Amino acid sequence: MNWADAIALAKGAENPPPRRDERSEAEWRAALSPEQYQVMRLKGTERPFASEMCSLFKPGQYACAGCGTELFDSASKFESGTGWPSFGEPVADGVVGYHLDTSHGMQRVEATCNVCDAHLGHVFPDGPAPSGLRYCMNAVSLEKVADA
């Protein structure tokens, strides 16, 4: 995965998810905290440096806080200085969805959980090798689920 791949996927290239989690908005509202619902379903953004997850680098996996799909591994996590947890790549093809985002007068690539469509954050082309990508994620959209 590189920036050209992320743009192609955001423009509609095929990116099949491993499965789907289809719930009503009422079910999501009941399952998520108010902050999670605001970020994950309404595409909000948590404040930078609001979570200790930014400085958590213990081995393990990070999953979608909505559906539990494993999205990132701590091996690809890095300190970006942005105030949000940042990763260089997802754990597998198809787990992250990519969408063009022109909100707030900007052109960005939104990252979503490809299983439940939860807003995770954005992807930028300024990350470390080998991908050169920075997956800048909202911590409330993730949960640490397993230690290596």
For each of these PLM feature ranges, what is it?
Residues 7-9, 14-15, 19-148:
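A short Gly-Trp-Pro
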